[in-house]
Structures are given as structure tokens and as C-alpha cells.
Amino acid sequence: EAHIYGTLHYGQEWPNNDSSGQAYSLPDGSNPADDFHTYAIEWQEGEIRWYMDDYLYATQRRSEVRYNSNGEATGLSHRGWYTEYFEQGTGELVTHWDNAPYDQEFYMILNLAVGGSWPEAVNETGIDPEAFTNGQSFEIDYVRVYECGSDPETGAGCETIRPGYDSL
């Protein structure tokens, strides 16, 4: 598999949760598992960005919601994080744009997802048994967490978005 994925999981508990993300392949087509790489996530109010070897490959932003004079939500950006599910009690389709917990404390999970429906969804052949032979392992050299300041005028943090980048 020559892809990595930056994915947000948010909303209610399964099965009413949601996720969104972006795949990235190395420019030369090589397998990311063949060597160590530097992965980074920048998280600031209303936006999360993913990098591999200093290359920005994905951005997710909070949905923007406007309200009409009747107080009804309009203008929901379906490019941001939001959830839609059928309410069990009423059977109505419910849309929530306020279920993204990225303005609250949470913890980080570093994992190698190989089970469930994920392999078949992203790789037509499913799990490759050869990936688990000859002593293969999932190795992490180090994890660092930094807090970057924000520009008091713009509110932007970290300031590392590359010029010409178009977010999701």
C-alpha cells in the first residue's frame, strides 16, 4: 500500500459517528513503510492540517453555518466537519455541525489500522498477508508535541501552510 491517510473521526458514538479525510501518495510512488518519515498535525481553532515530510497534504476546517431570519441554519459547508444521522426515536435525518470536539482537550492515538472494513475500502485486495511476514513491525522513533503561538491580528497559528495550497 503506497498511501497514507489523514482522517478525522467525530460526532456521536458509533454508528452515528462520522469521519472525513484525505489520502496522500509519495511523489515517486514509493511505499511509505519502506523508510522513516516525519508526520505532523497542526491543530488550531477551527482547522486541522496534516503533513508528511513537511509537505501539507490535507486540511479540514470547521463547517460554517449561517442562520436565516427564522433562526433556521442555512449555508452549512459540507466541506467541513459535520455529522448526519437518522435519529433513532423519530427516524428523521439530523445534521449537526457542533459535534466536532476540536475545541476541547483530547488524546492522540498512533495506530496501524489493518482490520474491520478499512482494508477492503481503501485497497481492493484487502489485507496483504505478506506485510506481516519476516518480522515486520510498526516502529515509531519519537513523538513530540509543541504548542505554537497565534498571530494576535489574524488568530492564525503555526503559519506553515504552503503557498498555493487549496484545502479540502
Model-assigned labels for residue ranges:
Residues 1-168:
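GH16 jelly-roll
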